[in-house]
């Protein structure tokens, strides 16, 4: 049974929250302290109903206030609430013409690196059609319906708020179920920051009849394709694992993606739910960012990787949020290139093996052997003119 915890900070500051935020905090604490799966389901349903109502009404402030409060006061309750919020923003049950549909916002991430510029932008009709066909053939369950946004997104172009994300989910879901083109504004998306290594995303929604599997790896002892399944959905066959689906996805979709990313190297990740793939792409891009920075400097400055020094320091306010890596040529005291290595989810400086060890290993693999680790935790600083992070040098 979970240990019951009482947070003095929550009681002392409760009056500063709106009633909606207070109810979210109470529900998250109830779920964190639950003693059974039956009680879990009660709290999960209560939280889901409140969160969906707030997001559908565009009232995200209460959600963010509750998350901020719990993030400072109760880590387990914060985890319960953020999981519920992410679920409400990426999934929904819609009823259309008397049929209930489970709908999920999904993404197919690409980890991309280059010495030049990583593209983002519109997919041609042929490219979008080919990519959609590969979703049906290698990722989605037999009875799934799917709608792909014909755009290769950068992280800067994805919806910034949980309410906006849920709005995109529902629009795409209606389109996937009904077949009409969705109304998604792609003309006013922001410019993309230039990075040597970054993630790109293909975004879509999968919809299935209530309770049916969404992905091929869920189809265990499933019957053949139903009459309502899309014409290009796969026929009945043996169960495919996640690994098999990923292997097939990479082999078949990569030729369609290569023309979208000229001059770039890239890896394809397994298409899956939106938020888990956001975290996975963040995790996977970190070592590529370090390698790309070293590769860029060795070519731009015509030197060997062994002639670079790395200065690594931890940054954060109340805890370590990220490590910053400054790369300094041996004939200079100035940082020539910097890389941010964020800590993700439950990661911390106490992990075994530690994130610092992972950073050291990537630097050594890239040929950088002179590595200095600063012991103290620093307040994050940014350039006053352009807002980019400031990186540690050797002094």
Stretch-by-stretch model annotation:
Residues 117-375:
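Extended, non-transmembrane interaction/recognition domains
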Residues 389-393:
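Short, non-ligating residues that shape and space the ligands of small metal-coordination modules
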Residues 1-175:
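Long, leucine/valine-rich, helix-dominated scaffolding and oligomerization segments
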